């Protein structure tokens, strides 16, 4: 069972906050809302559809950051990538609800927040 003000889907609880903040602030905010809380993550397109049905805005942070730095990259010759020269600005992911597109953007930008536990 989810607390009041939270919505339930497939054993998880979700809460939509129509307040914009940076990714770091949003993730910290979600951890403070409920034990085990984090920015929303998705395991299926049905989960996305559920969330979109309760949203009142388009763009929101997802719990995924540093997409390029976290990937296990390798060069075309098969050798491991040990040297990286990405831009200094870390990238985080927002979801655009109107068409369920995931977009890479600066983590320092502000977007709405959806928490999940």
From Swiss-Prot:
Keywords tagged on the record: Disulfide bond, Hemostasis impairing toxin, Platelet aggregation inhibiting toxin, Secreted, Toxin
GO cellular component terms attached to this protein's record: extracellular region
Compartment(s) of residence: Secreted
GO terms under biological process: venom-mediated suppression of platelet aggregation
Main location: secreted
Tissue expr: Expressed by the venom gland.
Domain C-type lectin span(s) in chain numbering: 9-116
Disulfide linkage: 2-13, 30-115, 92-107
A GO term for molecular function: toxin activity
Secretion signal, residue range per the UniProt entry: none
Key word Aminoacyl-tRNA synthetase present: no
Cross-referenced SMART domains: CLECT
Assembly, per entry: Heterodimer of subunits alpha and beta; disulfide-linked.
Similarity comment: family membership: Belongs to the snaclec family.
Known function: Binds to the subunit GPIbalpha (GP1BA) of the platelet GPIb/V/IX receptor system. It inhibits ristocetin- and vWF-induced platelet aggregation in platelet-rich plasma by inhibiting the binding of vWF to GPIbalpha.
Name the record gives this protein: Snaclec CHH-B subunit beta
Organism of provenance: Crotalus horridus (Timber rattlesnake)
